[in-house]
Design a protein with these regions (language model features):
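Hydrophobic alpha-helical transmembrane segments of membrane proteins
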Residues: 1-84, 97-245
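A glycine- and small/hydrophobic-rich beta-loop-beta segment
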Residues: 87
């Protein structure tokens, strides 16, 4: 049972929401299917990159080394949308929202270890350098996740827990989500390409690691900023969540 994961108890209220995230991943049909699809696709990418020359050019190397990590953040694009089903309960105590945001960040940061491990065959095969994968993983956990989590401020459409997302709920047609997702995917690639051209590969990967670590180490600061901005819009968002159920 999820409640038996006592390892999370040491994190207090944030730990309880970590349990909730894990429970949601296992029981929520939409989140579970997204996760399974992501795992299968990452394995396919790893095999193709390791044993074929299909993605041997410079752009493909950068794109396909980043994509497995951004793929893990697909559920973050709809951050707070599943919670729209019971958002009024969370708002009974405002601190719940901050703890929930922290739990989401920690949970999705930890899950980045999965694509990192699955992509290790590309390192063994000599397709990608280990430093590149480390840079992409840490950069994703840093500025990329910071960008995606800011969607919690404006997301106000409830995502059904067990019905298909093709249902006309407005979740799938949120153009802000699409734009942010595209920026989160292609901005790091553009940044790596430009830096690589000027300072070389290894300094570029080290730069990504340093920037990523800076965001990771300051996560409580920018999560608190997101929380405060959410509280300013809580009634508007609450109305949106309740009307879209």
């Amino acid at each position: 049972k999820i409640s038996s994961f006592s390892v999370f108890d040491r994190f207090g209220q944030t730990g309880e929401y970590l349990k909730l995230e894990l429970k949601g991943m296992l029981r929520n049909k939409n989140m579970r299917h997204t996760f399974i699809f992501s795992m299968g696709f990452i394995v396919l990418i790893s095999i193709l990159d390791s044993y074929t020359g299909l993605y041997a050019d410079s752009f493909s190397e950068k794109f396909w080394s980043l994509y497995p990590f951004t793929l893990m953040s697909m559920n973050l694009v709809r951050i707070m949308c599943p919670e729209g089903n019971y958002i009024e309960c969370l708002l009974v105590r405002k601190e719940n929202i901050r703890s929930l945001l922290e739990a989401k960040y920690y949970f999705y940061s930890i899950t980045l270890l999965i694509p990192f491990i699955l992509m290790l065959p590309t390192v063994i095969a000599g397709t990608y350098p280990l430093l590149l994968l480390m840079g992409m993983m840490i950069f994703t956990a840093g500025p990329v996740y910071c960008m995606l989590m800011h969607l919690a401020i404006i997301n106000k459409v409830t995502m059904p827990l067990n019905t298909k997302l093709t249902r006309k709920t407005g979740v799938e047609t949120n153009y802000v989500q699409v734009i942010v997702e595209m920026v989160a995917m292609f901005l790091p690639i553009a940044l790596v390409s430009v830096l690589d051209a000027f300072i070389g590969s290894i300094p570029t990967y080290l730069f990504m690691i340093i920037v990523g670590l800076a965001f990771i180490l300051t996560n409580r600061i920018w999560i608190n900023t997101i929380y405060k901005r959410m509280m300013k819009r809580k009634y508007k968002n609450l109305e949106g969540f309740m009307s879209s159920r």
